């Protein structure tokens, strides 16, 4: 079955261009030029991935991302005409999984869409060579890969697809340090550059907050300075 992609961008030429490229890849596309018109589609929940522009005429793209994250965990890719690092960090903080800066090459967006859907539907990190069980646990933390559920002391923890994937990689390698380069390659399936470190840092911070693990001596995700992270 074809995945359903939601596009919300008030720049009609960009939205139309993305629609053409996505349909050429056999995706089902729901395209809107403002957030208001897209609300019924969003509320239906029948979406596999959303592409949101930050600057919309009727709603801030960040606010829309936050609204979606209250109910849904499907991947969100933000489009921005700005290049400030703060925009990227803000989007990731509110639950976005990736961002693309305008102007962009349509094929780059398609590649990112495929990567996000691949990770969301079926995750298999590249740095893990042995078969990993469907359920992983450490102390009071439990991660079920098949149901995409995270439990902390028996209570559900809502994670974005990227947060789930990062935690999966680290938990699958419990006791060992996972370098930032390995983590980036495993989760994003892309080459690591030093500028990507802030992306990892933001997601790790969110994970710690959701796991109530923000003390100076974290119980779960530990930072090994200059190397990476471990559980």
What are these language model-derived features?
Residues 149-219, 224-227:
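Positively charged, aromatic-enriched patches within helix-turn-helix-type DNA-binding elements
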Residues 32-33, 56-59, 86:
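Hydrophobic residue at a beta-alpha junction
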Residues 16-24:
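Charged docking surfaces used in two-component/phosphorelay signaling
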Residues 26-34, 41:
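Short hydrophobic/Thr-rich beta-strand motif most characteristic of the beta2 strand and flanking loop
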Residues 46-51, 56:
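Active-site beta3 strand of CheY-like receiver
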């Amino acid at each position: 079955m074809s995945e359903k992609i939601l596009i919300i961008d008030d720049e009609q030429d960009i939205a139309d261009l993305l629609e053409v490229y996505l349909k050429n890849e056999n995706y089902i596309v729901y395209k809107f030029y403002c957030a208001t018109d897209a609300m019924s589609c969003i509320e239906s929940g029948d979406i596999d991935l959303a592409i949101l522009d930050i600057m919309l005429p009727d709603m801030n793209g960040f606010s829309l991302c936050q609204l979606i994250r209250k109910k849904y965990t499907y991947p969100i890719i933000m489009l921005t005409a700005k290049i400030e690092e703060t925009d990227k960090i803000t989007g990731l903080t509110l639950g976005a999984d990736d961002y693309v800066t305008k102007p962009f090459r349509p094929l780059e967006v398609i590649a990112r869409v495929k990567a996000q859907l691949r990770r969301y539907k079926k995750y298999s990190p590249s740095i893990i060579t042995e078969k990993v069980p469907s359920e992983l646990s450490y102390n009071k933390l439990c991660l079920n890969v098949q149901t995409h559920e995270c439990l902390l002391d028996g209570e559900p923890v809502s994670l974005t697809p990227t947060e789930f994937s990062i935690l999966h990689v680290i938990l699958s390698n419990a006791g060992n340090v996972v370098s930032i380069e390995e983590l980036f390659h495993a989760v994003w399936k892309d080459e690591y550059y030093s500028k990507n470190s802030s992306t990892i840092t933001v997601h790790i911070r969110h994970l710690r907050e959701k796991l109530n693990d923000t003390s100076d001596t974290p119980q779960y995700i530990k930072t090994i300075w200059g190397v990476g992270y471990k559980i």
